[in-house]
């Protein structure tokens, strides 16, 4: 694997870490704290 390819793959990994993890945490936080009240 060439260094440029390795850097590209690591940039994808860190991009996912920086974007996906905070988004997931935010969605879980919102879903827990802002539950929709449904009448039965």
UniProtKB/Swiss-Prot annotation:
Taxonomic superkingdom: Bacteria
Intracellular or extracellular location(s): Cellular thylakoid membrane
GO biological process: photosynthesis
Keywords carried by this UniProt record: Membrane, Photosynthesis, Photosystem II, Thylakoid, Transmembrane, Transmembrane helix
Record's GO cellular component terms: photosystem II; plasma membrane-derived thylakoid membrane
TM ranges: 12-32
Major localization class: membrane
Record carries keyword Metal-binding: no
Topology versus the membrane: Single-pass membrane protein
Subunit structure: PSII is composed of 1 copy each of membrane proteins PsbA, PsbB, PsbC, PsbD, PsbE, PsbF, PsbH, PsbI, PsbJ, PsbK, PsbL, PsbM, PsbT, PsbX, PsbY, PsbZ, Psb30/Ycf12, peripheral proteins PsbO, CyanoQ (PsbQ), PsbU, PsbV and a large number of cofactors. It forms dimeric complexes.
Function: Involved in the binding and/or turnover of quinones at the Q(B) site of photosystem II (PSII). PSII is a light-driven water plastoquinone oxidoreductase, using light energy to abstract electrons from H(2)O, generating a proton gradient subsequently used for ATP formation.
Family: Belongs to the PsbX family. Type 1 subfamily.
Protein name per Swiss-Prot or TrEMBL: Photosystem II reaction center protein X
Gene name of the record: psbX
